Swiss-Prot record:
InterPro entries hit by this protein: Beta-tubulin_BS, Beta_tubulin, Tub_FtsZ_C, Tubulin, Tubulin/FtsZ-like_C, Tubulin/FtsZ_2-layer-sand-dom, Tubulin/FtsZ_GTPase_sf, Tubulin_C
Example of a GO MF term: GTPase activity
Transmembrane segments: none
Location(s) in or outside the cell: Cytoplasm, Cytoskeleton
Protein's job: Tubulin is the major constituent of microtubules, a cylinder consisting of laterally associated linear protofilaments composed of alpha- and beta-tubulin heterodimers. Microtubules grow by the addition of GTP-tubulin dimers to the microtubule end, where a stabilizing cap forms. Below the cap, tubulin dimers are in GDP-bound state, owing to GTPase activity of alpha-tubulin.
Cofactor or coenzyme needed: Mg(2+)
SUPFAM superfamilies given in the database record: Tubulin C-terminal domain-like, Tubulin nucleotide-binding domain-like
Comp. bias (Acidic residues): 429-446
GO CC aspect terms: cytoplasm; microtubule
Binding site for Mg(2+): E69
Name of the protein this chain belongs to: Tubulin beta-2 chain
UniProt GO BP: microtubule-based process; salivary gland morphogenesis
Length: 446
């Protein structure tokens, strides 16, 4: 079976990752001891994508938990599903990265990375046919960003033909807990552009807006934000975990979603976003789901898709519904908003349907968009980066760990290149075709 090895790094990565395992264990009816209590073959049919089966019919997550300080991992271990993880797969240091990318990537993290790779090897060897890796981390801190990207490049070296997929939480000025976030994020993006196949950009700002506006929560906690992230991660991985009509694996997803290797940063979305109390009262219709799913307010990245164009889109519908209706609605959206889809990739919308809805909902939809509007997110980080870097503010924390200013300059220009590549494809052919049409019309008049 096609297995995935899951890695969670740093405080944010471990919190999101921990939540992800709670949600999918729940969907597959696996309790906190790893025992299956469900009654549906569908739940077990592809269980080994994410779980190893141990003696005594225990299911153990194929997860590796990494951090440079023990705190967060202790709280995962003492949490509701803490006992389900394999004890050997907790790998942690004592020093912490102090929100410093250089510590995570070059000094503290580099010392721990070999023991993580040993566990990665052990998990990979136990796989029948490994399809790839997924990493949950944030880009604003030190461990998830610095050590996370170090792990990615090391794993890439050792498994060059396996898919590397990340769920990356991008920092935002509205929800900031460190002043050096723009540095850490830019240095990380520099790595992600080169070394991952698919990156889901999750943005705290967007998550806060959803909690405020849509869910009407007055004081959203990180718990509420992580709840949204885990719903999205569960949706995105549905096709990998359940048999469906369109059986996706990580590679098929990449083939459908990534038209140019560097442009693999996706904007996730989820529907229905209803406050936790009111969701049972009425089931949404397929048109409503489709409408909501494409709505800018439902995007987990703080970018407005109406400011750009979609290169590719994947939608995953969950629940019992008519395939025909889903296809009609998806076509309907594309036809009505055709200017927001690039015309030089025909049929750039792919849809999958899975019969099993998430807990507590009759049906749901998850959205994955590769939109040129994601450049807004990189621009935002880049502006903050430049503001500080121009004055060399805080730079001594990084050079003190042996980094060179040159690396900052390279990362900055790589990110700016990424932005202009998105811009280039956003404008592609629309203008050229426009000029071309006029010539033709001119020819027609004669």
């Amino acid at each position: 079976m096609r297995e995935i090895v899951h890695i969670q790094a740093g405080q944010c990565g471990n919190q999101i990752g921990g939540k992800f395992w709670e949600v999918i264990s729940d969907e597959h009816c696996i309790d906190a001891t790893g025992t299956y209590y469900g009654d549906s073959d569908l739940q077990l049919e592809r269980i080994n994508v994410y779980y190893n089966e141990a003696t005594g019919a225990k299911y153990v997550p194929r997860a590796i938990l990494v951090d440079l300080e023990p705190g967060t991992m202790d709280s995962v271990r003492s949490g509701r599903f803490g006992q389900i993880f394999r004890p050997d797969n907790f790998v942690f240091g004592q020093s912490g990265a102090g929100n410093n990318w250089a510590k995570g990537h070059y000094t503290e993290g580099a010392e721990l990375v070999d023991s993580v790779l040993d566990v990665v090897r052990k998990e990979s060897e136990g796989c029948d046919c490994l399809q790839g890796f997924q990493l949950t981390h944030s880009l604003g801190g030190g461990t998830g960003s610095g050590m996370g990207t170090l792990l990615i490049s090391k794993i890439r070296e050792e498994y060059p033909d396996r898919i590397m997929n990340t769920f990356s939480v991008v920092p935002s000025p509205k929800v900031s807990d460190t002043v050096v976030e723009p540095y850490n994020a830019t240095l990380s993006v520099h790595q992600l552009v080169e070394n991952t196949d698919e990156t889901y950009c999750i943005d705290n700002e967007a998550l806060y807006d959803i909690c405020f506006r849509t869910l009407k929560l007055t004081t959203p906690t990180y718990g509420d934000l992580n709840h949204l992230v885990s719903a999205t991660m569960s949706g995105v991985t549905t096709c990998l975990r359940f048999p469906g009509q369109l059986n996706a694996d990580l590679r098929k997803l990449a083939v459908n979603m990534v038209p140019f290797p560097r442009l693999h940063f996706f904007m996730p979305g989820f529907a229905p976003l209803t406050s936790r109390g009111s969701q049972q009262y009425r089931a949404l219709t397929v048109p409503e789901l489709t409408q909501q799913m494409f709505d800018a307010k439902n995007m987990m990245a703080a970018c407005d898709p109406r400011h750009g164009r979609y290169l590719t889109v994947a939608a995953i519908f969950r629940g019992r519904m008519s395939m025909k209706e889903v296809d009609e609605q998806m076509l309907n959206i594309q036809n009505k908003n055709s200017s927001f889809f690039v015309e030089w990739i025909p049929n750039n919308c792919k849809t999958a349907v899975c019969d099993i809805p998430p807990r507590g909902l009759k049906m749901s939809a998850t959205f994955i968009g590769n939109s040129t509007a994601i450049q807004e997110l990189f621009k935002r980080v880049s502006e903050q980066f430049t503001a500080m870097f121009r004055r060399k503010a805080f730079l001594h924390w990084y050079t003190g760990e042996g980094m060179d200013e040159m690396e900052f300059t390279e990362a900055e220009s790589n990110m700016n290149d990424l932005v202009s590549e998105y811009q280039q494809y956003q404008e592609a052919t629309a203008d050229e075709e426009g000029e071309f049409d006029e010539d033709e019309e001119g020819g027609g008049d004669e």
